[in-house]
Amino acid sequence: QSGQHLADGCAGFRFPSDPITPVRFCDQRRKNTIPKWRIIDANGKDVFHGQFTATDIPVGNGLQLGTIKQTLASIKKPVKLTLLVSVNGYQNSWDFFVYPSAVTTVNKDILITQELNKEAINKLNEGGKVLLTLKKGTIKQQNGGSIAVGFSSIFWNTAWTNKQPPHTLGVLCNPNHPALKYFPTNYHSNWQWWDAMSHSNAILLDSVSKGIKPVVRVIDDWVTARSLGLVIECKVGNGKLLLTSVDLISENEKRPEAKQLLYSLINYMEGNSFNPATVLPWEKLISLVN
């Protein structure tokens, strides 16, 4: 099962795999084989394990060994897990992510908005905290809106393909940044970023502030090598702003990754670690969006 299908652990979700299908192109069938499976955590420790019924594996493909059904109710926090399936010493692996079913994405002290409206401006001027999660298409073309963000990387070379989309090469971040504490990640893209990359624009960081260090960076095409961001933080007016060009609000009841990332960002903003170093003038922020 592809990694973008994320599991809901606290609701007693049963992990269902697609049928496990071996492919064997040798001169003879493999007799009386017992395929085995394991689910491991990020440290390589077994969380669950099992095996399939002994079977003969013929030459060719199309044989279904069976499916894996495992209750995940014992998992209480967001984690990255890996499914391993092995047959006679040969092994394949698939990453997947488990998130709690119920997370709080409301905080009375933080204004969460998709628009830089009067309410958001007043909140910042009064010294408050604002989480601005922009809808796709909100960033102005010249500020990054024209850049085709994609989960998959560039095909071949945009200089040879007339700038065929996508124009980006995934994300780059610090997995230990407190803003990502409840959104397990490597320093690079994995399947849990597919949703974000599919609902976002890039922010051209130099149009905001030269030298600003984003919480999550987007890697640009090597031909243009622009400094791009997906999540940034700054001081605006008297307040603190966490700005993401990912739409984390629209239909997020159907998007567990969006809901979990939103929760992680809110949790970060609630703590003392949220203290942006960059001061952003109002005119820069206002000119960023349509």
Residue ranges, per PLM feature:
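Short, compositionally biased P/S/T/A/G/V-rich stretches that sit at domain boundaries
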Residues: 1-13
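Beta-strand-rich interaction surfaces with strong enrichment in secreted/lumenal proteins
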Residues: 8, 52-57, 71-72
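Beta-strand-rich binding/interaction modules
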Residues: 15-53, 65-68, 78-86
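Short, exposed coil/turn segments at beta-strand boundaries within extracellular/luminal domains
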Residues: 88-93
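Low-complexity, Pro/Ser/Thr- and charge-rich linker/hinge segments at domain boundaries
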Residues: 94-115
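Short alpha-beta junction capping motif
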Residues: 108-157, 235-239, 244, 265
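Catalytic beta-strand/loop cores that center a nucleophilic Ser/Cys/Thr
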Residues: 139-142, 157-256, 273-290
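Short amphipathic C-terminal alpha-helix that caps PH/PH-like domains
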Residues: 257-269
